[in-house]
Structures are given as C-alpha cells and as structure tokens.
Amino acid sequence: MNKLIRRAVTIFAVTSVASLFASGVLETSMAESLSTNVISLADTKAKDNTSHKSKKARKNHSKETPVDRKEVAPVHESKATGPKQDSCFGRMYTVKVNDDRNVEITQAVPEYATVGSPYPIEITATGKRDCVDVIITQQLPCEAEFVRSDPATTPTADGKLVWKIDRLGQGEKSKITVWVKPLKEGCCFTAATVCACPEIRSVTKCGQPAICVKQEGPENACLRCPVVYKINVVNQGTATARNVVVENPVPDGYAHSSGQRVLTFTLGDMQPGEHRTITVEFCPLKRGRATNIATVSYCGGHKNTASVTTVINEPCVQVSIAGADWSYVCKPVEYVISVSNPGDLVLRDVVVEDTLSPGVTVLEAAGAQISCNKVVWTVKELNPGESLQYKVLVRAQTPGQFTNNVVVKSCSDCGTCTSCAEATTYWKGVAATHMCVVDTCDPVCVGENTVYRICVTNRGSAEDTNVSLMLKFSKELQPVSFSGPTKGTITGNTVVFDSLPRLGSKETVEFSVTLKAVSAGDARGEAILSSDTLTVPVSDTENTHIY
C-alpha cells in the first residue's frame, strides 16, 4: 500500500514539474532539485501515514498533493514498446492532455531507466476534428543522448525533434516513438507539444444532366377522331436538370382544344433518373400525313426533339338521290340512288336504307327488301373508289310535298361511317269541276214561279280556283231572286255570280235562281261555268214548259 501511494504522488508531482519545464518556466537545475525533493517528500509521507487509518490517510494525501484533473488525465500503463528481452527500463506510464479542440496528444515514458541503456518515449496524437499541417515537437531530456525515432527525424540545435503530419482526420491516430539514452543519474524530463490547423471541407458534387425525349403515337388515325401522343422525358444524366420545358407545336391539319398553335409544358427541375410523361390530344381536320414534333430544353443543355408521323385516313361514304321535282298524283316516279366510297379504307357491311313518306307507295326496287314504305339494300364490302347505283319506282296517291330519305351505314377500321341524302317531290292533283242544272217545277203556269238549282262539284284531286257562273234565260222566264256562295247581279234575263276563289277537291257548292213565268211557251235556261282549270267554259241548258 505504501508503495502505491509513493508511486502516485511521484507521478503527479513529476508530471507537473515536466509541464512547467516544457513551458520554459523552470530551468534544468531547478527542475531536478524539485523532482528530488518531491520524491523524498513522498517517501516520508508514505511512512508517516502507515499508522493512520486509511480514510484519514486519503484525506491528508489529497490536501498535500492537489492535482488538476482537467489538465492531466489519470495515468495508464502502456503496453510496452521496445525490446522484450534485456530491457533496462520499467513499465510505461502515460500522461494524457485533454484538449477538446483540435488534437489530443499523449506521451508515455517508463517509470525508470538505466544509465547508458536506451529507453522509449511514445507520443500519440489523435485528431478530434479534421486537421492539416499538424506539427509535433518533442523536447529531448537533458543529459540524454538521442538514439533514433520512428518516424525518423533529426534533432535541432536546441535539442528538439519535429514531425510534420500533412493531414490528421477526425478519430485518426499518429504514433511516434523516440529512443534516448540517459547519460547520468537523475530525472529525465521530456515534453511534447502539438500545433494543428483545423480543416474544413466542402463538397460540391459535379455532374452532367442528360435529358432525353421519346414520343409514342399511332401510325394511322381517322379524320375527325382524337389522336393521342405520349411524350416521355427522362433525365439519364448524373446531375439535376434545371428548368426543363417541353414545346409541342400543333401539326398542320390538327387542332387542339385550347385553340393554341404551340403547346408549352413546364416540368421544372428533374433529378437524375426522374421520368415524366406528357399526354397531348389533337383532332385531325384533313387527310394525309401529319408529323408531331416535341422539343425539350433545359438550363445549360442542348435541345432534343422526338417526332411521330401519323397517316390520317378518312373512312368516307357518300350517297346521293335524284328524282322528279314534281309530278301528278298516281303517276309513277323513279328515284336513282348512288352510293360511293371516296375514302381511304374498305367499307364493310354497307346498308342502304330508303324511307318514303306516308302516302307514297313503292312500285318496284330491284334487289331490295321492301317493307311498307321502307326499302333496304345490303353490300358486304365497298372498296375505295367504288360506287353503286340503285333505282326505286314510287307513286303518290294524294297530292302534296313528299321527301324521300336515304341513309347509308357502314363499318371500317376507323369505326362506323354514315351518310345521308334526300329528295323532295311535289305531287300535284288534277281538278275536275262539273256542273248540274235542274228546275224544281216543270211545267209552270203563267204567273207562277220556278227555281233553277245549279250544283258545281270538283271531282278532281286538286282544288279549282276562280270558279265563275253565269245564267241566261229566255223571254218566257223573268229572274226574281238568287242565292249562292257568292254575290250575284240580275241584268234583264241574265244572272251573273261573282267568282268563287277556291273550290276544293271533292267540294260541292250550290247556286239557285227564282224565276217567274211571264208567257207561255218552251222556255230555256243556260248555265255557263268557267274556272282556272277549265280552259274552255262549260255550259248546260235546262228547259221549262210554261202554259
């Protein structure tokens, strides 16, 4: 126990003296004197404290030998450096300086050595942060001869060894071993210092962006059907591409829903390996080839383009119908239907459907299926440039304006295709105006009255217009009064009625004239009928016997 106390006191005291010596505060002779006194004092204290209790001994020891634990770390035994056989020095102990700034340095020396026999001094520098230009200086002990060092160096004129380490990383250690040979008895003081510049490292990652663009689109498309293109943009480089922009002019013959002619897509920054997809949709307005070109650009880079060419096809079917503009009812009329394929694709399952208005009767339609007023033809295929012709014979039973509607439906690689046409015929009727004249009393005595009734009937299928009636009587009869659908005038033995503007088909009107028998004889009454339809007036005569 006494031996341990002596060793601890000696180490702490010697370390303090060595620190003062290295800093230049103590001269060599003074350091040796202080070391000798410290060792003697430690021996005396160890003997005096033997009779005291352990608790009191520790208390007195701490009062008489104060140590700054922050500056000097506890002593640790080194794992011996130097030869294992025939060593003339004691076990190594280490003095550690806690420098929490740049570099931590420790120094290990043996407890004792033999005059004339070399012993090692081990210096270890540990980087607490990245440092450069690390300089370690070792003050050789006085009255000792330098033998060698690892790494090798040469003592300076004032007995110092200097090593320079270009760089010492954080946590990295650098070890130096110095062998010296003591020349006389006494304490060999040695001190080491370190100086380092902290290193700050900044990393700038340099790379090259590489923006590539590809485009996907159909080889063929249909007129007025949506065409979709996919624009794929990828950064295949090693750096971020800044301000990536894709421009897509609208191809000639295309239209975009926005109405713009150039579409611009701002993608912003793209990291290495990042992929973006843009979808654009156009409506083709004309047949032919159309090329969609997409151009990508970015900050500091070259522009890249990708294009896709699409052939715009028109699955077109056309139909027309021709017939008489007008005709008389019950007279047959022929319609000619023409179907053609002016497009680029084969039309399949072609159906031609002709629908007639009610009141029109189908008389004949070669190769068609007839159902009431509907006529249907079917064709399996209609090649581009090919045309077909069909005829249908019809007749209207009543006058009027009737329309004949034709619709053609077909299928193609671009979907269904439809076309329609119509023809209107005005069917005219024929007016047939007839007249009938009768007297109500026959024979008649002089002085009595009789009535002539005139019935006018349009037996035709069309109206008659401006129907006029005039009656002439012989001298035996004197007109007294009249009635009818229009006004009349009596002039002597003649009665004239105003014209009837319209006499419809199957319509009948009646005129009447009251006559007085004024003299005996065989009297006559003549009715004369005229109209726009009657190119020559029609007359009818009635006789009346008067006695």
From Swiss-Prot:
One of its GO terms (biological process) is regulation of cell shape. One of its GO terms (molecular function) is extracellular matrix structural constituent. Residues 23-40 form a propeptide. One of its GO terms (cellular component) is periplasmic space. It is found in: Periplasm. The keyword Disulfide bond applies. Residues 1-22 form the signal peptide. Keywords: Cell shape, Disulfide bond, Periplasm, Signal. Residues 62-79 have a biased composition (Basic and acidic residues). Residues 45-84 are annotated as: Disordered. Pfam families: Chlam_OMP6, DUF11. The keyword Protein biosynthesis does not apply. Residues 52-61 have a biased composition (Basic residues). Part of a disulfide cross-linked outer membrane complex (COMC) composed of the major outer membrane porin (MOMP), the small cysteine-rich protein (OmcA) and the large cysteine-rich periplasmic protein (OmcB). NCBIfam families: B_ant_repeat (TIGR01451). In elementary bodies (EBs, the infectious stage, which is able to survive outside the host cell) provides the structural integrity of the outer envelope through disulfide cross-links with the small cysteine-rich protein and the major outer membrane porin. It has been described in publications as the Sarkosyl-insoluble COMC (Chlamydia outer membrane complex), and serves as the functional equivalent of peptidoglycan. This is Large cysteine-rich periplasmic protein OmcB, serovar C. It comes from Chlamydia trachomatis.
